[in-house]
Amino acid sequence: FHWYSSTGWVMWNIQVGGLLSGTTICLFDGSPSGTRDKPDWTRLWSFAARNAVTWFGAGATFFSACQKAGVDLSEIDGLAQVRALGSTGSPLPPDVQRWGTAQFDALGKPDIWWCNVSGGTEIAAAFMAGNPELPDTPGRLQCRHLGAAIEAWDDEGRPVVGEVGELVCTRPFPSMPLYFWGDDHGARYRESYFAQWPGV
């Protein structure tokens, strides 16, 4: 299991948490894009191939940069063992997911599973993620996590389905932050999470 992350991002905690289930994790120390003088967006992919990574994750911007750089994964021997790709940090553009799927199709993996995730460092968890039993549609998250009361709301605070909306968690959950460091009276905390729709 490898998810490219700094130690300050929730994906670091999630990757290390994989050890609890007996997963072997592979850590990469360095720039995924090579150096300023010699950019190389295949570095992280080559690392994954050398270490027989079966689950490969990174921020959506990494996958976008690889597409923009014209990375050809068929030139890297050993990536066919990858069974799943994870993306988070920002929405993964549908064309980038289609690019990645085509790259793995060329490696003989036409049904590579994308686990697109939405969550946050401050909650140390995800609200929405993937399920390999559900359809995998570029530009969409597959499902809510168990126990997460998640809806998309329009500007008036009404739930919407099948259209763009604001991701809203409508009920408390175990890992929600209790306060912000140095925010003694909770003003910043309330403004950040509760101001847009009072009572939610």
Predicted regions and their residues:
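Short acidic-hydrophobic sequence patches enriched in Asp/Glu that either
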Residues: 40, 77, 142
